[in-house]
Amino acid sequence: MPAPSKKTLTKPPRRVFQTFMDFPLSTDMDAFDADIAIMGIPHGDPYNIDEVTNDQTNAPTAIRQASDQLIMGSKHWDFDIDSTLLNGRDIKVVDVGDVRADARELSHHYQRAEEAARKVFSTGASLITFGGDHGVPIPVMRALDVL
């Protein structure tokens, strides 16, 4: 299987200026610097072209949009943890956007997702992913081999 193209592995979320909980956007995976990364993997590994776009591909965007209703930023008091979200700790969280999909190279989507996750894990950061379909954890689990 040929390697994915050299363009960026991720792209900004679909809705302009909408990251998860308004955390900073960082799509340059080669200059990645954070303790926690949020990443959308909207597509799974489709069996055919008809399965590429469906409602589950909208999940990362919907979760990001709903995050405004869940919490009003990292300074918001969370009654479940009896503190602010990051509790005053110096924890850097970034949203790295969504893994790019290319309808001409469907077989490379999981490879891109795995490569992006591996880049996050190789920095020592934790990764939170929003999918897509039931297969989204597969490339993330494969990327754990870097640890």
Task: Identify what each model region corresponds to.
Residues P2-L147:
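Metal-dependent C-N hydrolase catalytic cores
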